[in-house]
């Protein structure tokens, strides 16, 4: 039987302060049962599989290993803020957000790779936090009592408990939340915590679904009450142009803080999920739908072709020479992952893949020993020259250890691991287990071990996606079991086909979850083919970008890497200067791009996002535009399209966005 799916409704399950004792936290554990939403929470459409259920394979495993061998695996050796003197390890050093940020990405990476060395690094942060709670219930270093860094640490502790079953976590969180509920009336949320309240509500809901303690819903309501009204702000969205430093400073007193924080890029990336998260407590359909309006407004006024919105440090318009902060990339991804689970909407997964396969790797070096603070879709130079940032400094698009500011140095590590842990989800319904099943929400080589209808299930996914459109899955239940398997059909994938054991199913509709319900037996094979057709999208001044599947394509400008300084180990800071012209306009029919573009594919290697061997290349006709030049290390605003040029026609080679570090992604279009 084959049909298109609908959303499911979940059921809470009991929670107790039980789990593995301290010291039983290493080695593989059988996947825990899926935890659904407990009444009276409004159910999510899908549920996250317990951490440890998904394992990377193929190129994704290699990418995570590159990360582990890069800065993530050695950060404490080269950066004192998360080194042995960190306040979150009992030292006298940095005691605010950086230790929790680092742990939030290090933990899932360590366990995805089953890497004993990385686990040991993470365990030190966890143990210190669990063993040094304050007598009143507060956690963390005594240097400050700011709510915000605790919000981040709670996210890390929930992951750790799922991965290890450590019996210390739930009582510590319970004591902390009871303390906070009593304290918030005297010491309300402020600054970052006020604007990022939804991240704590996630942890509150996580604990409620395991314990059923009613006070937790009172705490969630208080956090919402004291937090910034993001939904209301977007209902009357005022920030429709590039924010200037002068504009932010126009406000006095408290207005200054709120205006600056409401236009702050990372805050907006985290806020994307506030409607769906709060809808679980409020039960409001309108709250749940708010995510779509927020994304629409950000894309309309600040959208960029790599899937991001501009923010350098604040919202900065649609010019592709504006930047997007790396913290915003990974927080936007996390918001999409959470919003996708709650809403079950395919479009959120489409955008998630666009960020994961373009913006995330596009701002990291191939070996992941260096990153940028800001990346640009039209990035013609990475240097100390003045850039068109709103408030960020001149090092913001350099590649290095701590360009501009250290928040991204601590925070970017969560991007790949959390994406890997979101590839597969679980469906379920409150009334019975008829809808219990597995959901493929994003695609990458992976395998999943879980239980469906009390039957152990192993699914293997083999693919070179996003560089190819074919995906092969092998379903291996321990015994035959009937359940629905949902497969996401991206919105761009018209003409997709699905075969089960060689038999072609009814053609699925793009932008839906295809639902296959059958009795699955060991060795059942699924073949999915997504046509990877070329398509175009329109951006600033009617410029044009080219996409294929989830990948965005760019012209890779010649690069001259000049070392600015050496740090420790393999860490260095780099400027990158152009060695080839970049001011091209494309000559193609935007309505039928395949008629004017030649596509070639090569083998997907161990570094698929590396510059040396892009797995896909496009060849397209172009001409230089003499008046379009650069100034102070940035491309001037794109000329209005269509445009004419008398210069000689050339053939440009375009490659996946992430394989370039100097690039043009939004092109003027030549007049036909």
Residue ranges of each PLM-predicted region?
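Glycine-rich, acidic and aromatic/proline-enriched surface loops and short helix-turn segments
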Residues: 128, 159, 295-304, 491-492
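Aromatic (Trp/Tyr) and acidic
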Residues: 28-116, 147-163, 198-215, 219, ...
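Amphipathic alpha-helical segments of tetratricopeptide repeats
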Residues: 130-131, 181-182, 225, 280, ...
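C-terminal beta-rich recognition modules with glycine/proline-rich loops and embedded aromatic residues
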Residues: 26-29, 291, 350-358, 363-474, ...
């Amino acid at each position: 039987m084959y049909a298109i799916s609908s959303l499911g409704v979940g059921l809470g399950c009991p929670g107790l302060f039980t789990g593995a004792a301290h010291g039983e936290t290493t080695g593989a554990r059988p996947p825990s049962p899926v935890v659904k939403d407990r009444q009276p929470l409004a159910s999510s459409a899908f549920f996250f599989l317990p951490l440890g259920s998904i394992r990377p394979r193929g190129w994704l495993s290699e990418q995570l290993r590159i990360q582990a061998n890069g800065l993530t695996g050695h950060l404490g050796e080269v950066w004192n803020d998360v080194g042995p003197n960190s306040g979150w390890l009992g030292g006298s050093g940095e005691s605010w957000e950086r230790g929790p940020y680092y742990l939030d990405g290090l933990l899932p990476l360590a366990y995805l790779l089953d890497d004993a060395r990385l686990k040991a690094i993470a365990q030190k942060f966890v143990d210190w936090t669990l063993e040094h709670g304050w007598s009143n219930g507060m956690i963390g270093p005594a240097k400050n009592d700011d709510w915000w860094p605790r919000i981040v640490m709670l996210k890390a502790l929930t992951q750790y408990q799922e991965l290890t079953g450590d019996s210390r976590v739930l009582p510590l969180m319970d004591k902390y939340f009871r303390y906070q509920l009593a304290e918030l009336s005297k010491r309300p949320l402020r600054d970052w915590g006020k604007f990022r309240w939804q991240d704590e509500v996630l942890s509150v809901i996580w604990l409620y679904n395991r314990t059923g303690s009613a006070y937790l819903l009172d705490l969630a309501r208080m956090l919402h009450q004291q937090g910034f009204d993001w939904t209301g702000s977007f209902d009357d969205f005022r920030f429709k142009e590039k924010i200037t430093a002068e504009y932010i400073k126009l406000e006095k007193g408290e207005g200054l803080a709120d205006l600056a924080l409401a236009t702050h890029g990372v805050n907006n990336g985290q806020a994307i999920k506030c409607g769906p998260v709060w809808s679980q407590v409020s039960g409001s359909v309108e709250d749940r739908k708010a995510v779509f309006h927020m994304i629409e407004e950000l894309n309309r006024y600040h959208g960029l072709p790599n899937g991001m919105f501009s923010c350098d440090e604040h919202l900065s318009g649609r010019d592709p020479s504006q930047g997007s902060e790396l913290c915003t990339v990974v927080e936007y991804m996390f918001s999409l992952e959470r919003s996708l689970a709650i809403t079950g909407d395919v479009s959120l997964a489409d955008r998630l893949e666009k960020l994961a396969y373009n913006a995330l790797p596009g701002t990291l070096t191939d070996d992941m020993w260096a990153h940028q603070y800001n990346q640009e879709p039209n990035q013609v130079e990475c240097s100390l020259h003045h850039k068109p940032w709103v408030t960020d400094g001149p090092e913001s698009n350099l590649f290095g250890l701590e360009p501009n500011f250290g928040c991204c140095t601590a925070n970017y590590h969560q991007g790949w691991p959390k994406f890997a842990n979101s590839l597969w989800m679980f469906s379920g319904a409150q009334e019975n287990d008829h809808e219990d099943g597995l959901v493929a929400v994003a695609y990458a080589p992976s395998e999943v071990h879980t239980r469906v209808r009390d039957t152990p299930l192993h699914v293997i996914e083999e693919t070179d996606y996003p560089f190819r459109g074919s995906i092969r899955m092998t379903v291996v239940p321990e015994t035959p079991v009937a359940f629905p398997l949902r497969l996401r059909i991206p919105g761009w994938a018209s003409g997709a086909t699905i075969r089960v054991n060689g038999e072609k199913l009814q053609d699925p509709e793009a932008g839906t979850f295809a639902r296959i319900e059958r009795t699955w037996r060991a060795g059942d094979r699924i073949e999915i083919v997504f046509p990877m057709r070329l398509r175009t999208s329109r951006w600033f001044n009617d410029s044009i970008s080219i996409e294929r599947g989830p990948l965005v394509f760019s012209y890779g400008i010649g690069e001259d890497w000049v070392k600015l300084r050496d740090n420790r180990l393999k860490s260095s800071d780099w400027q990158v200067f152009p060695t080839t012209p970049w001011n091209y306009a494309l000559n193609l029919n935007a309505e039928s791009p395949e008629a004017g573009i030649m596509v070639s594919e090569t083998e997907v290697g161990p570094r698929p996002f590396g510059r040396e061997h892009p797995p896909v290349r496009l060849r397209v006709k172009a001409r230089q535009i003499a008046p379009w030049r650069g100034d102070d290390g940035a491309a001037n605003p794109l000329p209005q399209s269509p445009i004419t040029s008398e210069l000689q026609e050339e053939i440009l080679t375009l490659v996946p966005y992430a394989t370039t570090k100097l690039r043009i992604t939004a092109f003027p279009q030549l007049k036909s």
